[in-house]
């Protein structure tokens, strides 16, 4: 039944002249598209960090933007710098979102992967912020044993 409906729609579109054969792009267009992607400025590590710190320091950030930012940041092949995590934790505190703060710390531990020295370093750098904001680590909450 669906196939018959699709054939009728295709036949009607062809009768009205809406279906045109797609021509292959010319070789010049293919070369141009390749060249267009080879240029552009590359973001330095400092610019990357500043962009994310600014994002999380927005005074009007809401819970959705916080989660979107963290999901995007986690998608990169890196462990975020402590100053980015600090800004994200402060955003969680402004939103009174303790669960997201703990989840951010869990994600940092997960992103560190087999490099066991990264997560303790990040926690060491964030310890003053964690104490100031009253945020417990997943280990302090016993979540690492679950």
Curated annotation (Swiss-Prot):
Expressed in the head of epididymal sperm but not in testicular sperm (at protein level). The modification Phosphothreonine is found at residue 137. Pathway: Energy metabolism; oxidative phosphorylation. The keyword Acetylation applies. Pfam families: COX5A. GO terms for cellular component: mitochondrial inner membrane; mitochondrial membrane; mitochondrion; respiratory chain complex IV. The modification N6-acetyllysine is found at residues 83, 109. It is a peripheral membrane protein. This is Cytochrome c oxidase subunit 5A, mitochondrial. It comes from Rattus norvegicus. The gene is Cox5a.
């Amino acid at each position: 039944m669906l196939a018959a409906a699709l054939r009728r729609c295709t036949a009607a579109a062809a009768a009205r002249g809406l279906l045109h054969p797609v021509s292959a792009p010319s070789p010049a267009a293919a070369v141009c598209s390749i060249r267009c992607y080879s240029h552009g400025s590359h973001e330095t590590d400092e610019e990357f960090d500043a962009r994310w710190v600014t994002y999380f320091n927005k005074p009007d950030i809401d819970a959705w933007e916080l989660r979107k930012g963290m999901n995007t940041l986690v998608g990169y092949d890196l462990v975020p710098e402590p100053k980015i995590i600090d800004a994200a934790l402060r955003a969680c505190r402004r939103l009174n979102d303790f669960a997201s703060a703990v989840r951010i710390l869990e994600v940092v531990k997960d992103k560190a992967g087999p490099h066991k020295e990264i997560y303790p370093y990040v926690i060491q750098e964030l310890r003053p912020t964690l104490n100031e904001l009253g945020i417990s680590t997943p280990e302090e909450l016993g979540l690492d044993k679950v």
